[in-house]
């Protein structure tokens, strides 16, 4: 039995929730997010709160209810406050710039790397070696950050590459003679 699923998701003022079967739509000041919930989960909307429980006949009902609760809680936080992810570029000549919805990266290749951002994600560069991603969809922000990091992962000897701001890169010792 999931302890996570037992806690209701409180819906703050200014957030609108539409429940249509297993499709839930949450709208707030930062946009609108829609998600289809697993058939094993029963959702009830009452008193500015969403409650979750398993449907009869499903073995993994409580597990799916806990997952659904966590996803919908992230959606509510996303449309009210939003999510941010910070990336750092470490290395000589590594630079980033944002033009519209395209992130331009100079990562030591013979060509610049242009990454187009999906709808709902915005990026800004406070400095040439920092990228800040903002948006309402937690999963999409993480995916875009992982895609940008994948162009040049931090290497284990000098730590050069694209890394998350809170990431600790373990470096190896150089070869001894």
Swiss-Prot record:
Q: Which gene encodes it?
A: rplF
Q: Which organism is it from?
A: Edwardsiella ictaluri (strain 93-146)
Q: Name one GO biological process term.
A: cytoplasmic translation
Q: Answer whether the UniProt record assigns the keyword Ribosomal protein to this protein.
A: yes
- Signal peptide range in chain numbering: none
Family per similarity comment: Belongs to the universal ribosomal protein uL6 family.
Recorded hits in NCBIfam families, A to Z, give: L6_bact
Q: What is this protein called?
A: Large ribosomal subunit protein uL6
Note the subunit structure.
Part of the 50S ribosomal subunit.
Job of this protein = This protein binds to the 23S rRNA, and is important in its secondary structure. It is located near the subunit interface in the base of the L7/L12 stalk, and near the tRNA binding site of the peptidyltransferase center.
A single GO molecular-function term is: rRNA binding
Q: Which Gene3D superfamilies match?
A: Ribosomal protein L6, alpha-beta domain
Its cellular-component GO annotations read: cytosolic large ribosomal subunit
Record has Lyase as a keyword: no
Q: Which UniProt keywords apply?
A: Ribonucleoprotein, Ribosomal protein, RNA-binding, rRNA-binding
């Amino acid at each position: 039995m999931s302890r996570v699923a037992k806690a209701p998701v409180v819906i703050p003022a200014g957030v609108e929730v539409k429940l249509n079967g297993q499709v839930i739509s949450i709208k707030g000041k930062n946009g609108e997010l829609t998600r289809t919930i697993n058939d094993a989960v029963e959702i009830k909307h009452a008193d500015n709160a969403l409650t979750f429980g398993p449907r009869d006949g499903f073995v993994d009902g409580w597990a799916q209810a806990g997952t659904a609760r966590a996803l919908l809680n992230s959606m509510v936080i996303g449309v009210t406050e939003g999510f941010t992810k910070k990336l750092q570029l470490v290395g000589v000549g590594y630079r980033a710039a944002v033009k519209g919805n395209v992130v331009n990266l100079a990562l030591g290749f013979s060509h610049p790397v242009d990454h187009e951002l999906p709808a709902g994600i915005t990026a800004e560069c406070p400095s040439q070696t920092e990228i800040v991603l903002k948006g309402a969809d937690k999963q999409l922000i993480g995916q875009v950050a992982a895609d940008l990091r994948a162009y040049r992962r931090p290497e284990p000897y000098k730590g050069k590459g694209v890394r998350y701001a809170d990431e600790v890169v373990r470096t190896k010792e150089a070869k001894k003679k």
